[in-house]
Amino acid sequence: MSTDGNNNKKGSKEGPKSSEISKFDLAKENPKLAEWMDDCIKRMNSLYKDTNINICNVMTGHEIISIIRMVEAIFMEESNLCEAEAPIKVIGDIHAQYQDMNRLFDLIGRVPEEKLMFLGDYVDRGPQGIEVLILLFCLKIRYRDRIYLLRGNHETPSVNKIYGFYVECQYKYGIGLWWDFQSCFNRMPMSGLISKRVLCMHGGLSPELINLDTIRNIPRPCEPLDRGLLIDLLWSDPTNKGEGWFHSIRGISYMFGKGVVEQACKSLEIDLIIRAHQVVQDGYEMMTGRRLITVFSVPNYCAQFTNAAAVVCLNANLQISFQQMIPPPLPEGTKAKAAPAIAIDPNIDAARADKDAIKPFVKE
């Protein structure tokens, strides 16, 4: 059932079963599925700029479960290391800021006209995580070769049960849907490789990342443990405190310095690493020259920061540019601050060496 933004009734049409997915180019091979996805995308787009309704007004729980089943089947057909060709745009954390994600699309373009790779953290902290996921899932089903969805650390049950997504699912559709999403998250790819030369992930590097096959060979479905390659891909952070590996101030995974980035680029035969995971004031921050980029893609994060949003753009020749969305004014009285620099190449004379908080790690 198609609806516009003023219709407060839930849709009633039952979605196609996951078995209707064709193995290749499913939208062209299955006109019925393509028509339904177009309708779902239209309904999801009706929520943009209309804050009086949410996804419950335009999508039934049964439809959402059908969409989840279809997209997780597509994820399982993809490699853990999704390979895509440039030109492409790389998008960082969204954190349930559905309205801001759509404003970003207004700036950078939408699928299928643009090819996009998301680096995870679709849920938590903001109010519309289900909306973010279902729009992106519908786009993935409809245009699977134009959009790539990687897993973030918030796409794990131990995190999103605490930071908002569990309560959102409970309020909108019931706890059962939260479990369906966890099953889907366990099937999402962990990393992306653009034109064989640009490695993308949510968190960062790992002492266990020996070659790209170590990513490809991570079994799925999988739920992260407390350590290991998958945890590092989701959780690790760069630091300008030194060259090597350090224990993370997060209490999980590691921090890695300039020397680790340079060695990884050499051993993995890549030119650039793009990751997300940390809010940065300009929406992007570079380390080790342009060998590592952190990107964050929604503004005014949690209304606690005054950060801009940004997207990393790679043209066909892998030349880098950025599209930036300036943050809109926050409501009067909001106590927000600038996001701190995280690992920007420092002035060596001004760099602080926090030896107590950042402790070196030596791989055994």
UniProtKB/Swiss-Prot annotation:
Cofactor binding note from Swiss-Prot or TrEMBL: Binds 2 manganese ions per subunit.
Reaction equation(s) it catalyzes: O-phospho-L-seryl-[protein] + H2O = L-seryl-[protein] + phosphate; O-phospho-L-threonyl-[protein] + H2O = L-threonyl-[protein] + phosphate
Transmembrane segments: none
SUPFAM superfamilies referenced in this protein's UniProt entry, alphabetically: Metallo-dependent phosphatases (SSF56300)
EC number in record: 3.1.3.16
Annotated region described as Disordered, given as residue ranges: 1-24
Compositionally biased spans, kind Basic and acidic residues: 11-24
GO MF assignments: metal ion binding; protein serine/threonine phosphatase activity
Residues annotated to bind Mn(2+) 2: 121, 153, 202, 277
Family to which this protein belongs: Belongs to the PPP phosphatase family. PP-1 subfamily.
Protein name: Putative serine/threonine-protein phosphatase C06A1.3
Organism: Caenorhabditis elegans
